[in-house]
From Swiss-Prot:
Designated name of the protein: Serine/threonine-protein kinase par-1
Organism: Caenorhabditis briggsae
Main location: cytoplasm
Function: Required for cytoplasmic partitioning and asymmetric cell division in early embryogenesis. Phosphorylates and restricts the asymmetry effector mex-5 (and possibly also mex-6) to the anterior cytoplasm of the zygote. Regulates mes-1 expression during early embryogenesis. Critical role in postembryonic vulval morphogenesis.
Key words, A-Z: ATP-binding, Cytoplasm, Developmental protein, Kinase, Magnesium, Metal-binding, Nucleotide-binding, Serine/threonine-protein kinase, Transferase
Residue ranges, compositional bias (Polar residues): 13-29, 39-49, 556-571, 733-745, 757-775, 838-853
Residues at the catalytic site: 250 (proton acceptor)
Length: 1088
């Protein structure tokens, strides 16, 4: 699930800019392992199980064709031949006679470069011309391609099957099998499947509008009219899935894509499964903020009801721009979800509120079905003549004769009408069927396939002159031209290859190898500014090696990054630009690129050097920090834990709009997915699934991070260890392409030290180890700044990171209080990779190992590096997928004690834990009413934590089960003493509000005097209250057994424009009239 980690990095996506110098003219060997360069073994491909088979290599002469006469890997219309140069590289060549890239010594360098550029652009797979690479990962890469017959753009995912174990292959083919059954206008389409012994090609629908998540980040919450239009499409698509006995199980804003017309496309069916009445499922998968209560409770479920709950969370997110349930760790989120309490924004209509109450029902038996939801009043406002009804799929035997006639003309030399009709009627998902499907799609703008749009794909931040040239080049592009998307791995939450463009993202939602998922990621805001290269730009040669897919996965995707950027095996990407180019930008120099639509951060052949690129990128990113794109930081109130109680302050330095989560220490080469026996059904007997055997030993994705533990916390651990012993296995740290050997050794040493430190309090005071945040793996967190954390926090000073430090109060998202202790501190380095990351899809992005410890152990993480689970501006796309039963422990030897993010701590429940108030509100843009000291701070971009992957699902579920045992009693939130919130009296100040027209009660008294007066009046009126922060009180009045119960909060705020202080009233629950009555009475009685 989303907040529990980035463990599952099966296809950790890589921004194409990482291979900046890996073009055809580069002198660096692109492949050092010659055995990966496989020669073609056949001239003709065959058809396997209704799947077109593409050859894995080129031929020595002629054009390789499939059974349907389709060239599969041709360049320039000729044959694709691979000759080895002296540097050990393979070069595709064209022409009738020459098989060498360097034809003669007398040939000019200019003509050679032109030929190389022509070859790069003319690579074909089947009937698709590959335009550019838009995503790379450990096991797959994604190419933006153009169907040569219809001219439509598609996204081709190229998957290395040899890197997958049989279980992962089963999950992959189950996903493909499900996608083949789907035909809905709001679900991503699968057009074609091509397969060789080593490679699987999936041709998927391309969507250029990006993700709904990024739309919300760019524009803030939707008006209800706009949200209704989108939500009707979502409900229609999910109801269609349920009608076919399919559940999605990972519905969230990140998996909702937009096409060029801003229509919804549901993506990512990696966790989908079929269901049947009577056969309950028990796999806990999805994203925690979107997960239904029964998943947290460990109960089995039928299926559709978990999707219905997720739809309720999505509706709330669309209308409010925030999540209804939030928390700083899994335990806190679980409590809030199980209570089912959420805030209703004042601007939400009554009809929308009533509809939410049908979705967000704790008892799954009482949750409405989607058939009833479709009849709801809010769903049909403005659609009285078009009431939402279940989608009726067109009959399979309904054939479009016009398209058939076109197919006959197209394939007249190879197939007769009977063969064409058979392919279409039987839905073979091969060339003929794919062409038939694409002929039915709306034709795209041909201008987007121009040479300028095909070549201007560099992701670098270019100079002003280059930007001017790019601006001229983009005049020839359509404003609706799509931008590149990126592929992301289920097993990677941090390395999302973000490719940018105003058009949005590529819809790579279709498939994932069990945990290897190439979902479309939103394109990067920063890369969107870099966008176009001058017309002379030459794309990287990695687009020419389609016939040698295996080397592309492990060589090109990591070799250059490990050379140029030791910190990132998967190059950091940046956030996308708005689909329609409406994002406010501070730099006038980049305004001309707001319509850069065809630009894609794909290849980086024209970049002088990676160092120059990074410097230019940093310079532009500093200019592009936009307040409307930032989410607020939080400063949790200090914990009153006795003499050793430490305070927590989050730094608030201005953060560049880029991803810093390139530190991936666990890049597995063999994804492992465990699932329920009752869920891995007949697919295991599917004859179409090749069981790959003989796969060499692979490194384990499990990485045991080190611990940062203070002396007082270690004493608690020692006491708790007698009750719940833990296992620590330093050997579970494994080398990966993204962690250089020197960093790996540092991680190993720190882990050993932390392991021994768990038994000796003195060991926790060892000197901090040098750990550069950009180079350290996120799952191998060292105590690089533990001493600095303890020193600064014990003195009560806010932690510094970057240029400034501020404190910000964040109100809890529900009336429940957290019961965890947390200590945060910035990295020792001055990198702009800040530790406190606000997440949307899981605002507490926590790695699963953080929840694999016994819940009686309190772990306080100090001094996180940017490898913490809150990577700034990084999409933590994690999907939790595993058993929910306590006794189903993992067999992969993962640690019980995992890495604990900077601001996340799993503490002992009950009185033994320090109650710490505050929660992370993943505010999207334009939601600034909770900003603290807005005049003196900038806010971080809300990053996303996605869904939790498969390999650690069982351990996380076991941790949840342990939490359930401890929380077996009624969920009564512990009320922290007022003294606890007062530890930093001298440092905490009231929030400053810029807009004061809604402030009815003002005073010139000191804030503390106002708080005393408020408490006195509340006592006089018989109101129950809880002081959540120093200047905020949560109030309750009325009888909980009747409808008269009202909850609201009162906060003392500064009004700088009036030079006064004010009291802010905010209704949380209860009727409006009831709130107005009690609020007016209290306001009148306040003697301020």
């Amino acid at each position: 699930m989303s907040t529990v980690s980035s463990y599952f990095m099966g296809i950790s996506s890589k921004k194409n800019g990482s291979s900046a110098t890996a073009n055809k003219q580069s002198t660096r060997p692109q492949e050092s392992h010659h055995h990966r360069r496989q020669q073609p073994t056949s001239q003709q491909s065959t058809e396997m199980n209704g799947t077109t088979t593409a050859p894995s290599g080129g031929t020595s002469s002629g054009t390789t064709t499939t059974s349907s006469g389709v060239p599969t890997a041709s360049t320039g219309g000729g044959s694709a031949r691979y000759s080895s140069s002296s540097s050990g590289r393979s070069h595709p060549t064209t022409g009738g006679g020459s098989s060498s890239h360097a034809r003669s010594s007398g040939q000019s360098g200019m003509s050679s470069r032109s030929a190389a550029r022509r070859n790069d652009q003319d690579v074909h797979v089947g009937k698709y011309k590959l335009l550019k690479t838009i995503g790379k990962g450990n096991f797959a890469k994604v190419k933006l391609a153009k169907h040569v017959i219809t001219g439509h753009e598609v996204a081709i995912k190229i998957i290395d099957k040899t890197a997958l174990n049989p279980s992962s292959l089963q999950k992959l083919f189950r996903e493909v099998k499900i996608m083949k059954q789907l035909d809905h206008p709001n679900i991503v389409k699968l057009y074609q499947v091509m397969e060789t012994e080593q490679t699987l090609y999936l041709v998927l629908e391309y969507a250029s509008g990006g993700e709904v998540f990024d739309y919300l980040v760019a524009h803030g919450r939707m008006k209800e009219k706009e949200a209704r239009a989108k939500f009707r499409q979502i409900v229609s698509a999910v109801q269609y899935l349920h009608s076919k006995n399919i559940i999605h199980r990972d519905l969230k804003a990140e998996n909702l894509l937009l096409d060029q017309d801003m229509n919804i496309k549901i993506a990512d069916f990696g966790f989908s499964n079929t269901f049947s009445l009577g056969n309950k499922l028990d796999t806990f998968c999805g994203s925690p903020p979107y997960a239904a209560p029964e998943l947290f409770s460990g109960k089995k479920y039928d299926g559709p009801e978990v999707d219905v709950w997720s739809l309720g969370v999505i509706l709330y997110t669309l209308v409010s721009g925030s999540l209804p349930f939030d928390g700083q760790n899994l335990k806190e989120l679980r409590e809030r979800v199980l209570r089912g309490k959420y805030r209703i924004p004042f601007y939400m209509s009554t009809d929308c509120e009533n509809l939410l109450k049908k979705f967000l029902v704790i008892n799954p038996q009482r949750r409405s079905s989607l058939d009833n939801i479709m009849k709801d009043r809010w769903m049909n406002v403005g659609y009285e003549d078009d009431e939402l009804k279940p989608f009726i799929e067109p009959p399979k035997d309904q054939i479009d004769e016009q398209r058939i006639e076109k197919l006959i003309q197209i394939f007249q030399l190879g197939f007769n009408k009977a063969t064409i009709l058979e392919s279409v009627e039987k839905e073979k998902f091969e060339d003929i069927h794919a062409t038939y499907l694409l002929l039915g799609e709306r034709k795209s703008d041909p201008s987007r396939y121009s040479r300028s749009s095909a070549t201007a794909t560099g992701p670098s931040i270019t100079s002003g002159a280059a930007l001017a040239s790019a601006a001229n080049a983009q005049k020839h592009q359509s404003s609706a031209a799509p931008a590149s998307g990126s592929s992301s791995s289920r097993r990677s939450s941090q390395n999302d290859a973000a490719a940018s463009g105003a058009g949005g993202t590529v819809v790579m939602s279709g498939t994932r190898h069990g945990g290897v998922q190439m979902r479309a990621q939103p394109t990067s805001r920063q890369a969107a500014i870099s966008l176009l290269q001058p017309p002379s730009y030459k794309p990287s040669s990695n687009t020419t090696q389609i016939a040698q897919i295996p080397p592309l996965f492990n060589r090109n995707s990591t070799a250059t990054s490990s050379t140029n950027q030791p910190s990132s095996g998967i190059t950091a990407g940046t956030r996308k630009i708005d689909p329609k180019g409406r994002i406010p930008l501070n730099s006038a120099a980049v305004q001309s690129h707001r319509t850069a639509t065809g630009a894609v951060a794909a290849n980086t052949g024209g970049i002088p050097s990676q160092r120059d690129h990074s410097q230019q990128q940093q310079q532009y990113m500093n200019q592009l920090t936009s307040s409307s794109m930032m989410s607020k930081l939080i400063n949790k109130t200090p914990a009153a834990g006795g003499a050793n109680a430490t305070t927590s302050a989050t730094s608030a330095a201005a953060a560049p709009l880029q991803k810093s989560g390139s530190q991936i220490s666990h890049a597995p080469t063999e994804p492992v997915i465990r699932e329920d026996d009752d869920e891995s059904n007949s697919e295991h007997q599917n004859g179409n699934v090749p069981l790959i055997g003989g796969v060499g030993p692979q490194t384990s994705p499990v990485v045991a991070p080190s611990e940062d533990v203070t002396s007082s916390e270690q004493q608690k651990q020692e006491k708790a260890s007698s009750e719940a012993p833990k296992e620590t296995k330093p050997s579970m740290i494994h080398q990966s392409p993204s962690m250089p050997p020197s960093q790996m050794m540092t991680a190993m040493e720190s882990l050993k030290l932390s392991e021994s430190g768990g038994k000796s309090p003195s060991n926790s005071q060892q000197p901090p180890q040098r750990a550069t945040s950009q180079q350290m793996s996120r799952s191998a967190t060292t105590n690089s700044a533990a001493n600095m954390a303890s020193n600064q926090q014990s003195s009560g000073a806010p932690q510094q990171s970057g240029a400034s430090s501020q404190q910000c109060h964040t109100k809890p998202s529900s009336t429940s209080s957290s019961s965890s202790s947390s200590t945060t501190a910035p990295t020792s380095s001055g990198q702009p990779h800040h530790q406190h990351q606000l997440t949307h899809n899981a605002s507490f992005s926590v790695t699963p190992s953080a929840y694999q410890m016994p819940t009686t152990t309190t772990i306080t993480s100090g001094a996180p590096t940017s490898s913490s689970a809150f990577p700034r501006n990084t999409r933590n796309r994690q999907t939790f997928h595993g058993k929910t039963e306590k006794d189903k422990g993992g067999d992969d030897g993962s640690d019980e004690i995992g890495d604990t993010p900077a601001n996340v701590s799993i503490g002992a429940t009950g009185a033994s834990a320090n109650n710490t108030e505050g929660t992370i509100w993943s505010k999207l843009s334009k939601l600034t009413r909770r900003d603290h000291n807005r005049e003196s701070m900038t806010q971080p971009v809300s990053s996303r934590a996605g869904t939790i992957g498969a390999a650690q699902g069982q351990q996380t579920a076991a941790a949840l089960a342990a939490i359930r045992e401890q929380s077996s009693g009624p969920l009564t939130p512990g009320t922290p003493p007022v003294a606890q919130a007062m530890t930093q009296e001298g440092d905490v100040k009231p929030r400053s509000l810029r807009f004061t027209w809604s402030m009815k009660t003002t005073s010139s008294l000191a804030p503390d005097d106002m708080m005393r007066e408020i408490r006195k009046v509340l006592d006089a009126n018989g109101c129950d209250y809880e002081q959540r922060e120093r200047y905020m009180i949560l109030c309750v009045h009325g009888d909980p057994n009747t409808d008269s119960l009202v909850q609201w909060e009162m906060e003392v705020c500064k009004l700088p424009r009036l030079s006064l202080n004010g009291v802010r009233f905010k209704r949380i629950s209860g009727t409006s009239i009831g709130f107005k009555n009690i609020a007016s009475k209290i306001a009148q009685e306040l003697n301020l």
